[in-house]
Amino acid sequence: EAHDLLICLNTRKDIDDPTRMRYTRQEWFKTTQEMIDLFPDLPEAIENTQEITDKVEEYELDSDPLMPVFPIPPELGTEEEYRQKFSQEDLFNEFTRDEKGNVVLTEEEANKKIKKLGGYDRLYRIKLEADYLKELTMKGVVKRYGENPSPEIMERIIFELHIMKTMGFPGYFLIVQDFIRAARDMGVIVGPGRGSAAGSAVAYCLGITNIDPIKYDLLFERFLNPDRISLPDIDVDFDDAGRQQVLEWVTEKYGADKVSHIVTFGSMAAKMAIKDVARVLKLELSEANRLAKMVPEAPKMTLKKAYKENPDLEKEKQSLNPLISKTIQFAETLEGSIRQTGVHACGILISRDPLTDHIPIMPTEGESLMTTQYDGHFVEPIGLIKMDFLGLRTLSIIKTCLDNIKKSKHIVLNENEIPLDDEETFKLFTRGDTTGLFQFESPGMKKHLRALQPNRFEDLVAMNALYRPGPMEYIPSFIRR
């Protein structure tokens, strides 16, 4: 009965609608004997089914990363040329030693690492990508740090490139820097970087981020750590309209059959379960609202928790009104069930192969780009590469401002070239005039900004870090110092 109700909910039909979808109530995996009893006149069909079952091999869906093939300029070399140029011993030494050539693994550990990376066949491709990544990075080093970067900078760059190579991820960085470069070429506003990726000097030199991690002492190990093998996680911010432009560019480059959205599943929370079941059972709206209001307002509230906080709700299960008791009974059963599907706000898959080779997909309402039928918890274990494309209204506002300044003042500004020590900007912070400014707009933050009178970027970094439960109590002493 509960499943019947769920069908009504998903098809938006009433329980007593004669035209609604109905199941035969025969939908379960039957035993061999049950199938023989159902089809006594078709023994050959039973035998054929068993034969097919016996031929099914064991397999796993999980896979190593299925990295899209990034096109490498032919003048750098090809995989075939690399096979002739480098021996397996060369690759063994390059991928199992540290960036200075020191032996850091036992032979057993080294062989395990080679196998984990996909064997020597895969290493030739990784090395080719790593060499191209190094070439692009070194061009970026000159742009970011000049012709003669310090030994500290070069040591950091070489270390990061080595980690990226020996973890098997140079192709990932080539893909990300490529669509970010394309976005900027199309006039899309790209965010300066967020999260642990801001700790990478290579990402900074490639233009993936616009924050110097060496200047601000940001840790690369929070981003990539050989002791914790996982795909890099780079969130990229675009202006709202620009995000769609970049998606279209990526789809054009890699193919519509290799790019998709990621599905999300919306489950039924306690309040919604009561309201939905009541609607299908045709319980009066006033009664449905009364029952729903008896569920406390709290994150991750369940009916089981609600009964403890409000015993009157549990008593409704014994209501003399059968519609009320049934509503609570079925709401208990259906709570947590999948209510509807949606599209992940920012997650995009870019695959090496057609996605249908690895994952079921479905049409996306109002879009040509398809959507996976697996959610984000399952796409990465099976090897598919997830990129986060975020559309930010803040960046859209910045883009509009720059366009308006260009039209009205005939001044062309680049948001990345506005100095971080701009005096007029700091006056806004010292006055607490930060309404609408992310993480600086609460009344408490404004009060502390007026007390601090910040005059350098680092002051704002410190205040942002301190303004949270726990460290917040030290803000007054920080301001005094």
Across the structure, where does each feature detected by a protein language model lie?
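Alpha-helical scaffold/interaction cores of sigma-54-like transcription cofactors
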Residues: E1-R481
